[in-house]
């Protein structure tokens, strides 16, 4: 959802993803990765469909289709990719799979992006969180700064929220009852974070004063070592407005 949100806000039509990297994990050094050369199209389709469901409309193969003449996948390989050469494990399914991804990508580029709610991206949470717990770490994933496990809250299901950040809020306008940024418009702003930069809070207050409905699902804290007394005052002023609520289901 993050790259799809960025594309919509920037007015871009194509959302790409380098796909199928380290499909079953990887080996840190030497040799092939787990089940390399045994890749299943069924597994790759699960990944492709998940990307499509989150707004991707252009799959880029992270594959290795070439080898020196007369040599095969056992002579030359890249540990993080899927082998898609003439001796690929799934060569008989490759064309149909590519055709499927092409067709879905074409459909995904039709029409206009729709969203009803702007959702504040918890970037400050990722900076303050530092490391993921062991249960969420992988050999190539350790830090919250990567935003790999950031999801829209369940109470926004059906509203098709797009992520926005402080820059978007600072440049957005509230006119004719909607929040506008580029070609996108939103009827409300939802904020569900533990930490919030004071600059973003100022923009939220500005827009709320202009009439934008705002949901502050949690009371955020100010990140960083140096705190400002203004933060609490701004938050109090924001929550006193009639168009600002702390109850997402209202």
Where would I find each of the regions flagged by the language model?
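Carbohydrate-binding surfaces of carbohydrate-active enzymes
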Residues: 1-250
